[in-house]
Amino acid sequence: MGKTVVIKCGGSVLDELSPAFFASVRTMREQGMDVVIVHGGGPEIGQMLKKLAVPSEFVNGLRKTTKEVLAVVEMVLSGKVNKQLVAMLRQNGLPAVGVSGVDGGLLEAEPIDFAKLGYVGRVKTVRSRLLRTLLEAGYIPVVSPLGIDQNGQTYNINADTAAGAVAAAIGASQLAFVTNVPGILRDGALVAEATAETIERLIEDGVITGGMIPKVKAALSALSDALPEVMIVSGKTTFYQNGTWHGTTIRKEVGVYL
């Protein structure tokens, strides 16, 4: 296999994915890259919990997951959102196969803090053989962020951290977080590059706010010697063309504050 790119699509951006997004994915494949997509589904989960009158709360930014909440999370992520995204990819000429982190024990999980969060898990191990098998057969694996432990208990996993774990396990050359903006913006202009140091300053200065904060923190935590840079890109426009990425590049090394 050649280079592998992991793309993380947040639940809030799935309805806004444009033809340009799918064209970017097609370009990658035409250039010999393998693509794995990990998706979220927070807004859809919230709507379904409300519709079914299942009580839910957030603790430190994570959805406390009772057995009742977990049943809805599984239904929405694997039964609805995953299949919708697979259908969208196929409509755009991209051969996709939807899997859950439970399938084949792909994402082995353990509870983060059962007393506080219930069935919210962290990825303990990624069994990447299933992904490699699908990639070698020419498919784009589309992964819903559910995990399973050795006793067969399923867990709700944060999609950003799941994407980072998958990228590390398969030796991805790039990890891209897809949002509804072109990247980190300052006064409406794109911040082309950022490091941990510059990101902390941008947060302090109120440049990075709201939902972008957990995105950039997840991007920073995904950085390693094997994955020295991560992208934040838009799902509304072309983010990869002619071998060039369009968005904010987040790197490990110290850079200049922009």
From Swiss-Prot:
The UniProt entry lists the main location of this chain as: cytoplasm
Q: Which Pfam families match?
A: AA_kinase
Q: What GO terms are given for molecular function? A: acetylglutamate kinase activity; ATP binding
Which pathway? Amino-acid biosynthesis; L-arginine biosynthesis; N(2)-acetyl-L-ornithine from L-glutamate: step 2/4
Which SUPFAM superfamilies did the record assign? Answer: Carbamate kinase-like
GO biological processes: arginine biosynthetic process via ornithine; L-arginine biosynthetic process
Q: Where is this site: Transition state stabilizer?
A: 8, 215
- Give the record's keywords alphabetically: Amino-acid biosynthesis, Arginine biosynthesis, ATP-binding, Cytoplasm, Kinase, Nucleotide-binding, Transferase
Q: Where in the cell is it found?
A: Cytoplasm
Which EC numbers characterise this protein's activity in its record? Answer: 2.7.2.8
Q: What domain of life is recorded for the organism?
A: Bacteria
Question: What's the catalysed reaction?
Answer: N-acetyl-L-glutamate + ATP = N-acetyl-L-glutamyl 5-phosphate + ADP
User: Which GO cellular component terms are attached?
Assistant: cytoplasm
Q: Which amino acid positions bind substrate, per UniProt? A: 41-42, 63, 156
Give the matching InterPro entries.
AceGlu_kinase-like_sf, AcgluKinase_fam, ArgB, Asp/Glu/Uridylate_kinase, Glu/AcGlu_kinase
Purpose:
Catalyzes the ATP-dependent phosphorylation of N-acetyl-L-glutamate.
Q: Which family does it belong to?
A: Belongs to the acetylglutamate kinase family. ArgB subfamily.
- Record protein name field: Acetylglutamate kinase
Native organism is: Geobacillus kaustophilus (strain HTA426)
Q: Which gene encodes it?
A: argB
